[in-house]
C-alpha cells in the first residue's frame, strides 16, 4: 500500500513538472502557426494587388491592340486612296520615276499592313465556328495559349481514336441493340463536329492544316448526321455490318496515322522546319524535308486500303439503290455520294502527298 501510494505521488509530481513544458510547446506552435497565417495573409494581399495591376495592364494591352488595329485599317484605306490618286495623275516622263517610287512605297506599306493585321485583328473564324460560338474572338495572342490549343487537339484525337474500336466491338456483340447503334451514331457526329471546330480555331491561330482535311470533316459530319437519321429499315440492317467493319479499319489506321504524324512533326519542329502549333507533318511549307521514311512507306498501304474501302462503300450503296425496284431511303443515295467524295478526296490527297515526298526525296539525294 505504502509503495503504491508513493508511486502514485511520484507520477503526479512528474505530470506537474511536464505540464508547463507541454504548455510552452503548444504556445510556441500556436505562435508559429499565427506567424505563418499572417505571412500567408500578407502574401495573399500582395498577390491580390498584383492581380489587379496585371488585369489593368492586360486591359491596357488589348486597348492598345484595338488602337493599332484601327490605325492599320486607316493606313490601308489611305494607301489605297493614294495609289488611286497616283494612277489618275497625268505625269510627265520626268515625273514617272517619282510616281513609280511612291507606288512602290505604298505597295510595301499595304503588304506590311496586311501582315500586321494578321497579328492584331480579332477573328471570329469561319461560318462553322460562328454557328457554334457566335461572333466571338477565337484568336489567342499568347504563344503558350496557342500551343495549349494544339495539345488539347492532339489529346482529343489520342483519347477518341480507340473508341472507334470499342464501338465496333459493341456493335458486333449487340448488332440488334438500338441503344448501342444510336450511341455510336451520336458519338460519330460529336467526334467530327469537335474535330472540325478545333481545327478551324487552330487555323485562325496560325496552324498549318490542309484545306481538304477541313472539308473532309465537314463531309464526315454530313455522313454522321445522315447515319443518325437513317431509319432502322432493311437497308440499314443490310449496310450496318459493312459500315461497322469500315469504322474499325478507319480507327486502326487513324491510330497509326496520328503516331506517324506526331513523330514527324516533333522532328520538324526540332529542326526548325515546322510551327510548334501545326497539327500534321504534311504542310506544303515543309517541302525541303524529304519525308520518304520507312514509317511513311509502312503507312501507305493502310491508307490506300481504307480509301478503297470508302470507294467500295460508295459503290455498294449505289448498287443497292439500283437493284431495288421499290422505295429506297434518301439516306442510301446520300451515304453513297458522301463515301464517293471522301474516297476520291482522300485518295487524291494521299497520292499528292506521297508524290511530293518522292520528289523531295529524289531532290535531296541529288543534292547530297
From Swiss-Prot:
Which residues span the membrane?
164-184, 186-206, 212-232, 236-256, 291-311, 332-352
Keyword Ion transport attributed: no
Location of region: Disordered: 1-23
Q: What sections of the sequence does the record tag as coiled-coil? A: 25-96
Q: Which UniProt keywords apply?
A: Coiled coil, Membrane, Transmembrane, Transmembrane helix
Protein origin, superkingdom? Eukaryota
Q: Its membrane topology, per UniProt?
A: Multi-pass membrane protein
Q: What name is this protein filed under?
A: Transmembrane protein 120 homolog
Q: Which gene encodes it?
A: tmem120
Amino acid at each position: 500500500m505504502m509503495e503504491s501510494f508513493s508511486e502514485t505521488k511520484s507520477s503526479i509530481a512528474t505530470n506537474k513538472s511536464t505540464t508547463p513544458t507541454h504548455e510552452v510547446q503548444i504556445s510556441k506552435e500556436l505562435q508559429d502557426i499565427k506567424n505563418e497565417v499572417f505571412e500567408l495573409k500578407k502574401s495573399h494581399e500582395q498577390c491580390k494587388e498584383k492581380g489587379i495591376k496585371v488585369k489593368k495592364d492586360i486591359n491596357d494591352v488589348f486597348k492598345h491592340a484595338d488602337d493599332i488595329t484601327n490605325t492599320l485599317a486607316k493606313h490601308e484605306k489611305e494607301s489605297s486612296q493614294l495609289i488611286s490618286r497616283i494612277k489618275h495623275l497625268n505625269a510627265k516622263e520626268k515625273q514617272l520615276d517619282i510616281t513609280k517610287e511612291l507606288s512602290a512605297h505604298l505597295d510595301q506599306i499595304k503588304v506590311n499592313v496586311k501582315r500586321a493585321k494578321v497579328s492584331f485583328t480579332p477573328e471570329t473564324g469561319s461560318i462553322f465556328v460562328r454557328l457554334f460560338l457566335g461572333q466571338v474572338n477565337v484568336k489567342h495572342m499568347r504563344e503558350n495559349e496557342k500551343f495549349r490549343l494544339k495539345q488539347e487537339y492532339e489529346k482529343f484525337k489520342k483519347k477518341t481514336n480507340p473508341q472507334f474500336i470499342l464501338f465496333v466491338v459493341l456493335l458486333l456483340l449487340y448488332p440488334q441493340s438500338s441503344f448501342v447503334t444510336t450511341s455510336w451514331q451520336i458519338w460519330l457526329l460529336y467526334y467530327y463536329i469537335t474535330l472540325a471546330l478545333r481545327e478551324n480555331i487552330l487555323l485562325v491561330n496560325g496552324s498549318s492544316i490542309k484545306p481538304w482535311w477541313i472539308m473532309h470533316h465537314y463531309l464526315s459530319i454530313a455522313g454522321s448526321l445522315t447515319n443518325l437519321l437513317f431509319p432502322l429499315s432493311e437497308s440499314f440492317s443490310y449496310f450496318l455490318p459493312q459500315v461497322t467493319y469500315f469504322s474499325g479499319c478507319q480507327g486502326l489506321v487513324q491510330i497509326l496515322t496520328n503516331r506517324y504524324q506526331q513523330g514527324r512533326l516533333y522532328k520538324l519542329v526540332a529542326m526548325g522546319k515546322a510551327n510548334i502549333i501545326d497539327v500534321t507533318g504534311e504542310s506544303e511549307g515543309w517541302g525541303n524535308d524529304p519525308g520518304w521514311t520507312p514509317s511513311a512507306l509502312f503507312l501507305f498501304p493502310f491508307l490506300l486500303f481504307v480509301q478503297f474501302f470508302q470507294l467500295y462503300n460508295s459503290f455498294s450503296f449505289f448498287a443497292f439503290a439500283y437493284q431495288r425496284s421499290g422505295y429506297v431511303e434518301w439516306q442510301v443515295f446520300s451515304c453513297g455520294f458522301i463515301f464517293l467524295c471522301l474516297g476520291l478526296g482522300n485518295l487524291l490527297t494521299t497520292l499528292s502527298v506521297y508524290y511530293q515526298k518522292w520528289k523531295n526525296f529524289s531532290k535531296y539525294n541529288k543534292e547530297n
